[in-house]
C-alpha cells in the first residue's frame, strides 16, 4: 500500500521495518525497542526509538499508524491489555494491529505438564522472559476486551515429533469428551 505508516513495538534492529520500507518505498516506518544498544543500531537507519512500551510516553501523534506490529511482544508484558489500550489512540480508525503470540496449549507443553514437567527455556513457548501465556481463545478475548475485533487469524504448526510416551499421553487426552480440537494442540504460534 502506498504511503502506509507502520509502528513496530519490539522491533529489534528494525529488520521487519526495513523489509517493509524496501517492499513499499512510500511507507513510513517507525519502531520502539526496549534494548538500548539494539535500538541505537537500528536508529542509524530507521526511525527507531528506545523505550519500554509499558512505561514510556509514546513519541508519536495520535491517529498516525495504519498498522501496529506486536510480533512476539504481548507475552513479555505485565499487562498486555493495558498496552493495547495505550496503543489504540495511535492507530488510524481503519488501522490494524498485527500480532503473534505462542500457543501454551501446544502438545509439547501439555505432554510435559501431564508428566509433571515444567521447564523454562532460553527460547520458544516457555521462554524464561514470558510473563503471559495464551491460547487461541484467550488471545481473541484479550482483543475483544480492548474493543477490537479479530478479523483474521493464522497459525504456525509444530512439526517436531513427540516421543512415544508423550504421543501415548496425547492420544489418551484426545479421547476425553469436550477437549479442545486436536489441531489446536499442534499450533506453535498464532498470528
Report residues per predicted region:
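Residues at the starts of beta-strands that form the adenosine-phosphate
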Residues: 5, 28, 149
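Conserved class I S-adenosyl-L-methionine
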Residues: 3-12
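A short acidic, Gly/Pro-enriched loop at the edge of an enzyme's catalytic core
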Residues: 58-67
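Class I SAM-dependent methyltransferase SAM/SAH-binding core
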Residues: 15, 19-56
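A short beta-strand submotif of the Rossmann-like class I SAM-dependent methyltransferase core
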Residues: 67-73
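S-adenosyl-L-methionine-dependent methyltransferase catalytic module, highlighting the catalytic core
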Residues: 15, 19, 67, 78-191
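A short, aliphatic-rich alpha-helical micro-motif
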Residues: 42-43, 62, 84
